[in-house]
Regions:
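Hydrophobic alpha-helical membrane segments
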Residues: 1-222
Length: 222
């Protein structure tokens, strides 16, 4: 494009922030979700992280990624507050997140995990034996989220609430392995491009979960 490195970084920051802010503004007009200052701060932190790495390292040693593991929701009946109607978490999930995989990949916060994938090789001394493609990733997720602030909703004029004892909202923290696809360096130019594009998705690999319920869970693939 003819832009200098600094101008390219600055332009990328502006475009990235504007693109991400669109979603936050749309949420701000929703009574169910509302504008989120932490979400906006996370957007700015992500863009800034990219810019700082590019400025100081001319490389992305820490990559932000996402994964989404499909969730099967309970079809057990939930009785309305008036006791005159029933629903289920399966029905609620269809309303909130959509019924097909692609909708749920984008919308289902219970299925999503957000990762910071660290390329260990790039932080060690030159000539180290750590595989250049093998990363350590830390992740953050949540469970039993069926509303913006609480698990209460309306359906055909009836009010429902998911029992917080049975379906507690809680946070999940992960540490696990990941693959930095561009570091594999395939010879095929087309494959190089594909690896670069899909590197925003974490590769399923063994991971350890620690959650705010006080549980430690090992996942063979996460």
């Amino acid at each position: 494009t003819g832009l200098s490195e600094q101008k390219s970084i600055f332009t990328g920051m502006i475009c990235g922030t504007l693109f991400q802010s669109t979603l936050e503004v749309m949420d701000g007009f929703s009574s169910k979700w509302g504008f989120s200052i932490p979400d906006m701060a996370a957007n700015i932190a992500g863009v800034s992280g990219f810019a700082l790495q590019q400025h100081y390292w001319q490389d992305q040693r820490i990559t932000l990624k996402v994964s989404s593991i499909p969730v099967t929701y309970s079809s057990d009946q939930i009785i309305s507050e008036s006791t005159s109607s029933t629903s289920s978490l399966s029905t609620r999930a269809d309303q909130l997140f959509g019924a097909n995989y692609f909708e749920r990949f984008l919308k289902d916060y219970n299925a999503q995990t957000y990762w910071a994938s660290l390329n260990v090789h790039s932080f060690l001394q030159k000539g180290n034996k750590w595989p250049a493609w093998l990363n350590i990733a830390v992740g953050y997720g949540a469970e039993n989220m069926f509303g913006g602030f609480e698990n209460r909703w309306s359906e055909e004029g009836q009010n429902f609430i998911a029992d917080n004892v049975i379906y507690p909202r809680y946070r999940q923290f992960y540490i696990g392995l990941d693959v930095d696809l561009p570091k594999i360096k395939p010879k095929n130019p087309f494959l190089k491009t594909i690896f670069s594009i899909i590197n925003i998705f974490k590769i399923p690999a063994p991971a350890l979960e620690i959650n705010t319920q006080g549980n430690v869970v090992f996942h063979l693939l996460r």
